[in-house]
């Protein structure tokens, strides 16, 4: 069965974004990119909430045409263009694009069914509201978090308070020169 992995940058007080949805606190330097991109590239399905998807769709398709884009940026842009995407949204229009599924009614059922299909792992990118629903349904198998050296004092929380108690096994942790700490936890089943 495929795994669902949550990848997110989180403040030390547990927020994925500030009070106005801002991500300006995230340190994403070359050292962290060297760590993150090898984790992302084998994933064959990206899972997004509407807001995160719109941010990604508004940025990554243009990177390949940007002569100033970094090597990391180009690699991720190629991955983004090729990966299957599942988006949780009640407001985005449905699409006939084969590599894009927009699900507004039963995202939990859609992800549960996708886990049973053949393929590589699936990764949730940020998307706090979606993460809350999938974690509450017991569908998140791994947590790959980068703990950012900042306290926001409020914003969009990683956890929504409805998740079932889960025992986790720490598989790895790494501290970066920037003060970011990357952790990899796997849910014990």
Residue ranges and their predicted role:
Residues 1-189:
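Enzymes that bind and transform nitrogen-containing heteroaromatic metabolites
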């Amino acid at each position: 069965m495929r795994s669902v992995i949550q990848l997110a940058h989180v403040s030390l007080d547990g927020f994925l974004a500030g009070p106005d949805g801002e991500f300006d606190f995230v340190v994403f330097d070359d050292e962290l990119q060297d760590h993150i991109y090898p984790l992302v590239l084998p994933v064959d399905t990206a899972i997004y909430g509407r807001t995160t998807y719109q941010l990604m769709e508004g940025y990554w398709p243009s990177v390949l045409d940007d002569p100033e884009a970094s090597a990391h940026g180009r690699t991720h842009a190629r991955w983004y263009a090729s990966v299957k995407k599942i988006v949780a949204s009640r407001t985005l229009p449905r699409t006939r694009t084969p590599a894009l599924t927009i699900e507004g009614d039963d995202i939990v059922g859609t992800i549960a069914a996708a886990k049973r299909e053949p393929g590589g792992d699936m990764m949730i990118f940020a998307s706090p509201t979606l993460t809350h629903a999938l974690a509450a349904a017991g569908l998140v198998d791994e947590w790959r978090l980068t703990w950012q050296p900042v306290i926001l004092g409020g914003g969009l929380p990683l956890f929504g308070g409805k998740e079932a108690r889960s025992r986790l096994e720490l598989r790895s942790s790494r501290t970066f020169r920037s003060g970011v700490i990357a952790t990899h936890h796997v849910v014990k089943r």
